[in-house]
From Swiss-Prot:
Residue ranges, compositional bias (Pro residues): 56-68
Signal peptide feature range: 1-22
Tissue expr: Expressed by the venom gland.
Protein name: Pape peptide
Chain intervals for the UniProt region annotation (Disordered): 49-88
Prodomain positions: 23-45
Biased composition (Low complexity): 69-81
PAPE repeats: from-to residues: 57-60, 61-64, 65-68
Biological source species: Tityus serrulatus (Brazilian scorpion)
A GO CC annotation given for this chain: extracellular region
Subcellular location: Secreted
Keywords attached to this entry: Cleavage on pair of basic residues, Repeat, Secreted, Signal
């Protein structure tokens, strides 16, 4: 099961247990707030909020590529063919 399904089952179970024991809503909210699952969700939310509000670090400049060594006896490129004139 995914986390959303487990979270829904958790809340429904707490709601049923609270309704059976008493009708006070404050105790139910207190129980939810102190539960381990909600503590984890709060800590993850705080962490995501810190990451979202933190300034982004400036990207480091990419290292310049090393110049390639030219081959010693490179043949001259063939003479470029003359360009043809276009008709107007």
């Amino acid at each position: 099961m995914n986390r959303k399904t487990l979270l829904v089952i958790f809340f429904v179970t707490l709601l049923i247990a609270e309704e059976v024991n008493s009708f006070r809503l404050g105790g139910f909210l207190k129980k939810i707030w102190r539960s381990k699952l909600v503590k984890r969700l709060r800590s993850k939310g705080k962490q995501l909020l810190k990451e979202a509000l933190a300034p982004e670090p400036a990207p480091e400049p990419a290292p310049e590529p090393a110049p390639e060594a030219a081959p010693e006896a490179a043949p001259e490129p063939a003479a470029a063919a003359p360009e043809r004139r276009r008709r107007r």
